[in-house]
Every structure is written in structure tokens, then in C-alpha cells.
């Protein structure tokens, strides 16, 4: 009888390549925020998927930044490097048909002493098989990978094959978490991330990714969560964009975030959200530490 397998699996890749979407698909529910805006993932987020034979502990990482060099981005890049050094398997995500310089720069960081699984995402968007084969040849010439698995995170295509491939490379270990655990994030952390996701989705390109959410108060009373949060922006011009005419945009952000929280926490949620201008917060080490971003 085969032994139970369990290990840490890093999910790495350039910004906005689909890492958070893939993590949420593999786990079966939202544990990492997603949006069309690059750099929405700032924290290492563990997503956990357990079967009768194995436990997959996924560590999502920020997209490795090569364009921006501020304090926050340096801290996030440091976390990517730390994640690569303490996981059992590294899974790099690329976009089918598009090998960018940023992808090559991430490849340079990949360790040589553990299994490297290349996950080619968005294969549903490539209609020409010859084009896909040419792309795969380009990728394999750029770096040596242990395995290559094509998937569509958005459509859920070929994820069973990906899990099978990952399981083959996991070490034999007892499970690290309970069978029904799906993340190590606290409800407080997830609440902040869900609010930030709605800002990105509803404000589009009007707001840069320099937005943070601080949870000022989180109270539990039976089947009710009372959450008071502040959206931090670094420019005066961003505040009215998030608030919207007559406060309608902020109301929509709050409502959508609250509904997601109620689904995630399986409880009623009372949510109050404010917007505050805090210039230079992304370069303030003390502020980053208070937000868990140092």
C-alpha cells in the first residue's frame, strides 16, 4: 500500500498570468483574490487540497516585479525568493502562446534542486495546434522543466492531470492540515483581500494597484461578523473615484465584498468601509508591517 504524500507547492509566475485563479480552482473555493489588474496578490496564501492519497499545500506568491522597485515591491520579491527556497515542488505558470521577458526573468530564479512543473495556462485561447507546439518548443529551450502540463484555469480544463503530476513529485509525509482545511488565512485577512479585490474589479484602470485595506475592527458574535475597514489610497484624486457619485461606487464595493464574506465565513456580516488618503504608504516600512506586507 502506497504511503500518504504531502508537500508544499509554490505557484510562481509574472504578474497577471492567472496564479490566483488557478489556486482557487485547485482548492475549490476562493482563497486568493483575482482581478484583471496585475499584482493583486501580495501575501503568501496557502490553499489546501486533500484527497485520500495526498495533501497538496499550495503557496501563492506575488507576481515577481521587474518594472517597479519601491519598498513594497522589493518586499514582495523577497517573499517570492523565500517561497522558492522552502517548498517541495515549484509550479511555474505561463500564458500559452506568449513567452515574455518577465517570464524568462522568473525562470532565472527557479531552483535547480527540486521538481519544476511548467503549467501552460489559457490553452483554450490558442486555436492553432501548430502555434501551441512552436510555443512549447520555445519554452523548453528557455529552461529545463521536469514536467509540462497545459491547462485552462478559468475553464477548469486538465486540472485532474495537473494534480496527478504534482502528486507524483510530492514526498511521503503525514498531512500538515486537517482534511477539511482549505487555507491558512484568517477571516480577518480574507476580509481585507475581498474588499481590495472589489476595488480593483469595480474601479478598473482608474485606480493603480497601490491600494491597501486595513481591518480596523473584527468582531464575532454568534453567527454574525462585524467588520470595520479602511481602504488606503496614496493620492487625493483616488478617493473620489472609489467613493463614486453620491457614494454609490463605495456602496457597491462594500455590498459585493460583504456577500463574498458571507459565503466564505458561512455567517452574516455587517460591514462598514471608509476611504482614507495615506500618501506614500507603499514606501512606509512601519505601515507595510502593520498590513503584513513587510
Regions picked out by a protein language model, each given a short descriptive name:
Residues 18, 158, 249:
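Conserved glycine(s) of the Walker
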Residues 1-78, 82-84:
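Conserved G1/Walker A P-loop phosphate-binding module
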Residues 29, 48, 52, 64, ...:
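Conserved, well-folded catalytic cores of nucleic-acid-processing
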Residues 84-104, 113-131, 154:
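Conserved Switch II/interswitch segment of TRAFAC-class P-loop GTPases
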Residues 65-68, 100-101, 126-130, 157-161, ...:
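Switch/connector loops and helix/strand junctions flanking conserved nucleotide-binding motifs
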Residues 187-294:
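P-loop NTP-binding site
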Residues 12, 16, 22, 45, ...:
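Residue-level signature of catalytic and energy-coupling elements of molecular machines
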Amino acid at each position: 500500500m502506497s504511503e500518504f504524500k504531502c508537500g508544499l507547492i509554490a505557484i510562481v509566475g509574472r504578474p497577471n498570468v492567472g496564479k490566483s485563479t488557478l489556486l482557487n480552482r485547485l482548492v475549490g473555493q476562493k482563497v486568493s483574490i483575482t482581478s484583471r489588474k496585475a499584482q493583486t496578490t501580495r501575501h503568501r496564501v496557502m490553499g489546501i487540497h486533500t484527497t485520500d492519497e495526498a495533501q497538496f499545500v499550495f503557496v501563492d506568491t506575488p507576481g515577481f516585479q521587474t518594472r517597479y522597485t519601491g519598498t513594497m515591491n522589493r518586499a514582495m520579491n523577497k517573499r517570492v525568493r523565500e517561497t522558492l527556497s522552502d517548498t517541495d515542488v515549484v509550479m511555474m505558470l505561463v500564458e500559452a502562446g506568449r513567452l515574455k521577458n518577465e517570464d524568462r526573468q522568473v525562470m532565472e530564479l527557479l531552483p535547480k534542486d527540486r521538481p519544476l512543473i511548467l503549467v501552460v495556462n489559457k490553452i483554450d485561447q490558442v486555436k492553432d495546434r501548430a502555434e501551441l507546439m512552436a510555443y512549447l518548443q520555445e519554452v523548453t529551450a528557455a529552461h529545463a522543466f521536469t514536467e509540462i502540463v497545459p491547462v485552462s484555469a478559468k475553464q477548469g480544463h486538465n486540472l485532474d492531470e495537473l494534480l496527478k503530476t504534482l502528486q507524483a513529485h510530492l514526498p511521503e509525509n503525514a498531512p500538515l492540515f486537517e482534511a477539511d482545511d482549505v487555507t491558512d488565512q484568517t477571516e480577518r485577512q480574507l476580509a481585507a483581500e475581498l474588499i481590495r479585490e472589489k476595488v480593483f474589479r469595480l474601479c478598473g484602470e482608474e485606480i493603480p494597484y497601490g491600494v491597501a485595506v486595513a481591518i480596523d475592527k473584527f468582531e464575532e458574535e454568534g453567527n454574525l461578523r462585524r467588520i470595520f475597514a479602511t481602504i488606503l489610497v496614496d493620492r487625493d484624486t483616488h478617493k473620489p473615484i472609489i467613493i463614486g457619485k453620491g457614494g454609490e461606487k463605495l456602496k457597491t464595493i462594500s455590498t459585493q465584498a460583504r456577500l463574498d464574506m458571507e459565503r466564505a465565513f458561512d455567517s452574516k456580516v455587517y460591514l462598514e468601509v471608509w476611504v482614507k488618503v495615506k500618501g506614500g504608504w507603499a514606501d512606509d516600512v512601519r505601515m507595510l508591517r502593520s498590513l503584513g506586507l513587510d
